[in-house]
Amino acid sequence: MKVAITGISGRMGHTLIEAIQQDDRFSLVAAFTQEKSEEKNTRLVENLNLTPSPLLTHDFSELLAANPEVLIDFSAPQATLSLLAPSMQVSLPLIIGTTGFTETQKLEISKASQTLPIVLAPNFSV
């Protein structure tokens, strides 16, 4: 399964990368990063020992061009909400591990889940 991740530079991002690299059923095809510096992204790939190197991008349309089959999100509540509409447009299933949503934000995710497969599992790193 082709996987894309948001929040790649965080603790859970690192853990997910390790798990993906240890299981032949999964491949990391893209990662959404806030870094716009290609040099910093190159260092991130090297530091995380990403082999093969996935697409690192701050542009969601570029992430979608990598054709992921699922997007695992460990970002921030507002960033997660910004993923809903473009994910719905291409029917990209979401696994959301982000924490700190307000009740209103949870309702927005719930509405999106009526048309898009979404697993909302904050704190699943515990």
Which sequence ranges carry the predicted segments?
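Extreme N-terminal starter segment of soluble prokaryotic enzymes
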Residues: 1-4
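Rossmann-fold NAD(P) dinucleotide-binding segment
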Residues: 64-66, 74, 78-96, 108
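Glycine-rich, highly charged phosphate/nucleotide-binding loops
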Residues: 48-64, 72-80
